[in-house]
Amino acid sequence: MKIFDYDDVQLIPEMCIVNSRKECETTATLGKHTFKLPVVPANMATIINEELAEKLARNDYFYIMHRFNVDQLKFIKNMKDKNLITSISLGVKPDEYKLVDQMVQQNLIPDYITIDIAHGHALSVKNMISYIREKMKDQVFIIAGNVTTPKAVRDLELWGADATKIEIGPGKVCITKLKTGFGTGGWQLSALKYCAKTASKPIIADGGLRVHGDIAKSIRMGASFCMIVSLFAAHLESPGKEVEINNCIYKEYYGSASEYNKSEKRYVEGKKELIKIRGSIFDTLKEMTEDLQSSISYAGGKDLQAIKRVDYVLLGDYKD
């Protein structure tokens, strides 16, 4: 199969039909809710916290709260009390089965649950999906991942997932491919394409996006949403620790499988990086919106569907 990544692809424009890029609609629907953009900040401890999740929800952006040292029940109740969408992450450990029971018992069923482990094509994920479905029926939208193959996508959908996350290891602070030899680093976009061809439910591109134009490329290859890490790191609202170097303020961010997040040096597959503080995340979201509107105008349409229909070229050499 042809292997390529974001830098290897350029989209080919169609005739523009709008008078202004502002006419282009960037909204995207996932489950029962529609959001301003088809993007979501990564569910990592240095990317999102309770306060930022609330701000995003109030402004009609999708979020997924991370699962590390968070009182999930308190978080869900707080968001429900404020009439905001509830979106959390779960792993597959025994305590998280108990948490599912507690959610049901306390009538705190969230709108979205993301089952979030490094290798999502696993029996442990199948068992968790089955348990959530048994307890919560169709009251919750289940996102599961992460996976990289069409077979994995088919299995997750068959097991009951409503959407799947695609990637292993292309993120800037992920070192899975270096530690294990496995991953989609260097061919993430083609992995997305081949998985999307098989999928009958939404696909979420997770990681490897470095610039705003990569959102349009992901949509062209079949993504319904894009989970983004580095582009959403180091903002004023970001929970990462501030570090001063040579009179410049940086914020740190690290992978969920890093020793900094796990607080132990076992099965480490992530690292830490510093990024100079960028300003408000809502300024970035505004710029991202404008850039995506431009992408839609180049695609010859008025909404995201136009991007899915454009042709593209592969640049230079690629592996076949």
UniProtKB/Swiss-Prot annotation:
Keywords: NADP, Oxidoreductase. NADP(+) binds at residues 203-226. It catalyses: IMP + NH4(+) + NADP(+) = GMP + NADPH + 2 H(+). GO terms for biological process: purine nucleotide metabolic process. The active site is at residue 174. One of its GO terms (cellular component) is cytosol. Its EC number is 1.7.1.7. Catalyzes the irreversible NADPH-dependent deamination of GMP to IMP. It functions in the conversion of nucleobase, nucleoside and nucleotide derivatives of G to A nucleotides, and in maintaining the intracellular balance of A and G nucleotides. Belongs to the IMPDH/GMPR family. GuaC type 2 subfamily. This is GMP reductase. It comes from Mycoplasma mycoides subsp. mycoides SC (strain CCUG 32753 / NCTC 10114 / PG1).
